[in-house]
Amino acid sequence: MSFVHLHTHTVYSLLDGFSNIKKLVKRAKELEMPALAITDHGTMFGVVEFYNAAREAGIKPIIGVETYMAARRMSDRDSKLDKKSSHLLLLAENETGYKNLLKITSAAQMDGFYYYPRIDHEFLAEHSEGLICTSGCMSAEIPRDLIEERPEEAVRRMNWYYDVFGPDRFFVELQQHNITEIVDLNRKLVELGAKYSAKFVATNDVHYINLEDAAYQDVLLAIQTGKSLNDPDRMRYDSQTFYLRSPQEMSRLFAEIPEALSNTLMIAERCNVDLGFKGYHIPEFPVPEGYTTQSYLHHLCEIGLEKRYGARKNDPIIRERLNFELEVIHSMGFDSYFLIVWDLCRYASESGIWYNTRGSGAGSLVAYSLFITLVDPIEHHLLFERFLNPGRVSMPDIDLDFRDDRRSEMLVYAAQKYGDDKVAQIITFGTMAARGALRDVARVMEIPIPEVDKVAKLVPNIPGKPMSLSEALAEVPDLKAAYDSDPKIKSLVETAIHMEGTVRNAGTHAAGLVISDKPITEYLPIHRPTSGSEESPVKTVTQFEMGILDSMGMLKVDFLGLSTLTVMARACDMIKQRHGKEYDLNNIPLDDPETFKLLSEGKTAGIFQLEGGGMTRYVVEMKPKNLDNIIAMVALYRPGPMDFIPSYIKRMHGEEPIEYRHPALEPIFRDTYGIPVYQEQIMRASVEIGGFTRSESDDLRKAISKK
């Protein structure tokens, strides 16, 4: 007989669930289960990842949540009366139910959080449409009433749930674990359910995938509670049976109530939610009367072109480039996007807030004419297709840097302009890396800090190239020796290996902000401020991380606070006060010989991207003569291209011959002495030599960048 697990926790039930989503889905596939649910505690962090993994495996994904019910109202916060909350299982039957889950998990975080993200009965009743509800686990209201001998209260609650959900959407949940009181509880639930002709459903409250994972989930709980594994009073599960049991196991356990098994299939068949996101959710930028977003963008570009180029604005190259970009932008539906970013930059400029942009947006003449970017893409041979590829529609991505002491003003402006309910910061998830896993596990195993530090320091810490514990064991002889010689260290390392990659905490992206055309909870759930975001004027955080938001078509803008811009702005203020000269990012001289002399002497302290020891050494060897030399050095100073730095410097000083493999490559690579430094050079070469279109050249660039 087949069976579907409808009560399942993943690693996104933070420090409680030990089920990696991909491994969980893989195991369900091995067990030939037709469907599987995700029901994490109080959040929907993992639902999109789960949905995609399940669909890819050919398993039907069921979206749900195990929410927390407040003892009284979700706004009540009395330490004696409201500290304890109850669990409740909710599954989305359709799109309406999914949207109600978004609102339930959002309200629980934003309005009901008190020890746990809670909702109350009134809120649940208002958002019950499209949801299937069960009586829950042993920590739910009805089971708890029965365990604590309050049968009248259990009946009252049953009546309430039947009134709200009806007999077709409310199920009495039964579980079988090696726990003494659960036998008596199940008897009472069956007796109570019989009075209502209730539908029963079997679940297993899955918290880990395999039986042997119980020990690792126990370690996770100890990490969560900050307790030693040896502490007899710490929170722990009373049974090691909360794994993804097979259909055969579940059939044996519920042989006396077969309908509880078949109902899992019936519920799975009824639950149909499509998370195949379509389109983009960009706010419609408000334009003056008589304009559309398309015509207003064109109008602003013409004004900007006059300021940037003066009489040259009608140069055929400039005119053709502008018209091409505007056509591509409009065909992709991104007119409002550019107006939104323009407006942010306009506000910053008018408010005296220094800003700059980074990334491929510098290849856009539209962005340059709007004073979003400060670099002339035509003069510097920057390609628009590197930014927006006409052959592949994808959301533009312009990262904005603001002076860090005034970044919050920009966030306030965005929230006021588009609405607090349409703006949110972006969540991040911290996972246990090798060293962190060792230290977390050592703490609960009561291994002294000096001992674990010795072991942790044996794991190589290479920026950009994290090494797993398994790799370190294979590659670091001293670590392998400690592992082989000391049983305690062996146990520590083996346990930590299983902990690696487990989600440990939620944080906030340093710069990312979502700006939506509708209240964000129409599309995704939101979260209260996480660690690192408490001081932000934007008090909501998405429950979905960056990559998920991109796949949903949400507008994301990076508001990065940069101390370098603050220092520069203050320096220019001092110059104005002392010398009466006004400088900003548009008119600071880029060819000052004294500046390059200072850099050549290694005086790089405090200079963004140049002040590191290795970089400074190369700058001294290079003795830069112009800004192009500096730009090339910054581009080369990363793993891989760094190998070309000595040749670049020698060729620059005439100490090594410059060679081109084809005469047509000379104009492309002349400025970098025959060395490929920039991705745009590869794109131009593929067009000139390979006959690629510019769109195809960007596809080539992407393919190369993945190698």
Residue ranges and their predicted role:
Residues 1-707:
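Alpha-helical scaffold/interaction cores of sigma-54-like transcription cofactors
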